[in-house]
Amino acid sequence: LILLADTGAEQPHTYHFIETMDAWLRDRRLPEITVVKNVDRYGNRLDIETECLRSHTLPSIAYGHKQCSHKHKIGPQDKFCNNYPPCREVWARGERVYKFVGYDAGEQRRRDNALKYDLADKKYIKQYPLIAWGWNRDDCIREVEKAGLPQPGKSSCFFCPSMKKHEIETMRTQYPDLFLRAIAIEENALPYLTKVK
């Protein structure tokens, strides 16, 4: 099972790469990516852009928190797994499901910060194969190229406050409609901002 959580605001290259990756997986008789989304109890889509506009806020990372990833990435994946029969069967036996996390060898600090939560997790055994193999970002890029795949590009919302200046400039020139939507989110939140980190 390969899961990807769609926040409803991914950058265009991410959506394109899903199609490319699915074709690559099909050619190798591997399962395609299962895309999950944040929904309410009635099945209505809850995307992060609409949430920011309705609440007159920016993504939580602008305020020093990372709740957007928890709510729109981790939450939908956990909800899917909670209802996925193979996972339920493993848990019914009192065992844990293996979950593979794609942190590269340069991100060991992130893995280390998650360790106490990973050890306490009753449902999942987290594995970090890229770290175990010693693959840094350059190694990962090389392996992606060796597999005949294009580079996927950075996965983030098109209005993520963590974007670098060159990423914003690229979006402004390549996707002016998304750039204007990102500006609209900021302008919508501006009257309510008192402090931003």
Regions found by a protein language model. Give the residues of each.
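Nucleotide-activated chemistry modules centered on ATP-dependent adenylation/adenylyltransferase
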Residues: L1-K197
